[in-house]
Structure formats: C-alpha cells, structure tokens
Amino acid sequence: MQLALENISKKVGAQTWLYDMDLALHSGAVTVLLGATQAGKTSLMRIMAGLDTPTAGRVLVDGADVTGMPVRERNVAMVYQQFINYPSMTVAANIASPLKLRGEKHIDARVRELAERLHIDMFLKRLPAELSGGQQQRVALARALAKGAPLMLLDEPQVNLDYKLREELREELSQLFAAGQSTVVYATTEPAEALLLGGYTAVLDEGRLLQYGPTAEVFHRPCSLDVARAFSDPPMNLLPAQAATSGVQLQGGPLLVVHLPAESATGALTVGLRASALRVQARPGDLAVHGTVELAEISGSDTFVHASTAVGSLVAQLTGVHHFELGAPLALYLDPQQVYVFGEGGQLARAPERRKGN
C-alpha cells in the first residue's frame, strides 16, 4: 500500500493539532513517528486510519483520494496505547478472529506462532480479564499482526510493558514486520526504538513535521537542533560557541578545528555532542574538557556521568560499570570530528562523517 498525505492539517477549535505537512510513506516498510507526548503522533495516525478527517488536505491510498472514507471501509489494523480485546473470547480466539474472517487455513499454527513470538502462548486459553495490562496489550498486538492488513498503525504499543519485556519484543517486532508485507506506522517517544526498528523515521514536534527520511540518515544528520533534541537519548550535549578562523571556538573551552560551510562560518553557533562520543581515556587527536563529577548512575550495561565543566554541563555515556566520587575532578575527552554544529537559526551546519557500517 502506498499511503500519502498531501497538505494535511488539523485544527480543533482555536487549537492547531497538526500544521500543514506532506508525508508519503514507503510501501511495505516501517515508518516510525518519533516525538514527545503531544507531538501530534496519535492525531496523524487517526487521520491515516480514517478515524478523523483533516481540516485541510488529502489522504491518498495508491493514488486514490480516501480522505472522507470511513474507517470501516478501509483495510487497516490499529493498536492503541489503551488495548482493546474481545472480553468474552479467549486469547486464542482473539488472535484467530481476523484469520477466520479471511477463511485462512492452519489458523491454530499461526495463532501459536504469534503467541510464542509475543510471549503469551501460555495464556491462550485464558480470557483477557485474567491477564495483566501488558499481557492484554500483547494480545491486541498479536491480533493486529494476524490481520495482515496492508496498513498497520501501532500507537506506542509497548507503553504498558515492563522494560525487560520491551527490550525482548523490540527485536521480535522488527523481525515480524520484515517478514510481512504491510506498510507499518509505529509511534514512539523513544529514539532507541526508532533505531532498532530501522526503516524510515518522521520526527514530529508540537504538530509539526520536522524531518522525514531513512532512520539512520535522520539520526546521523538531524536537519535542526529540534530534530537533534528529539532524536537523542540521553539528550545531546549542546554547547554555546562562536565561529573562528580555523573552526569553532567553544565558549570557555578549546578551539575545535573543523570545516564549516561559508554561510555558517560567522556568528553564534551551537555545538552538539552525543553522550556516547565522550570518554574518560584519551585517543590520538582528542581534546580534553576538565570539570567535576555532579552525578554518576548505572543503567543496564552503561554508566552515565554528569559533569560540570567550563564549557557547560556535560553527560557522558560510558560502556561498562565505572565508579566516580561526587565532586571529584574529571577529564572528558572528545574527538573534534565527532561534533555537530548548528547555525544561529538552529539549522545543521556540520555533522560527523559516518563510519562504515553505521
């Protein structure tokens, strides 16, 4: 299915929920809608599904205008944050329902396959009311996958799941999407989820479409400060700077010898540095930034250390478990070639060169 939105906007009363935008999804691929709460992800999905109509603009499916077509006439599967299951039917019957409507063969085998992939095979004989919220959400997700609709819309489908299960299911979902032929739209607030799912990413902020493209490209070359903020977890370190003759001068810090395009080589700049680009051991060509430890926390297999420095507050993401004394002096090292530079208006002026395989 080729879904395209042309000059879509949505107003409710005096409020604008979606500003004018164009978005053409890639058929058979995953498109992630990435943005904070109230970025416009759900509003956009409801228009895609036919649950809402835009105030202006058109919705096209394979070139045909379906803007006013009700949802019941569209072949769409949608999973909401708030799961919806048939309460009087067992888990197995819930998952099997779209398969039976299509008259498919080997229904039991397909139901069990999906249940196993989503870790709910032990609940097949239970009713939804006997399950936890996270388990019910997985039932709704399995039913949507079973439907095999040409357009599948998933609105933060893992929001009710615990951290460990989310990590397990992300890879499973990526494989399930790749194995199917549906055009998938997946809304999330988590950059890590977008990176794992791959495909394409549309970054939304307060109803505006900021950037759309291949996920890796959007992550590595955010077109603006707003995109960089939305597509960074932990947040990108953003530091005030000035253009200099041979590069960028950090305010209160070292000179970064990097090339800037002529139109960005003057005035106030912002340097962006991902937390993973900072380290505590120097490599050839690195520059040092000195400060003191404000906070250190371990999350999973990484350590996050927050430091107060002359160039501003910095957060470094270090692989492995590291121990730091609060208030202790700390030297963080960075490779100038790994910095982003944004112009005075927030537009991207420079991005690090991508390494092979990234």
Model-based region annotation:
Residues 75, 81, 85, 90-226:
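ABC ATPase nucleotide-binding domains
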Residues 49:
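Helix-to-loop junction immediately C-terminal to a conserved catalytic motif
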Residues 3, 18-20:
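Conserved structural motif at the start of ABC-family nucleotide-binding domains
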Residues 57-65:
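Conserved ABC transporter NBD signature motif
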Residues 34-36:
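The feature captures the beta-strand-to-loop junction immediately N-terminal to the Walker
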Residues 42-45, 139:
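ABC ATPase nucleotide-binding domain helices that frame the ATP-binding cleft
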Residues 55-58, 206:
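Conserved coupling/switch loops of ABC nucleotide-binding domains, chiefly the family-specific signature
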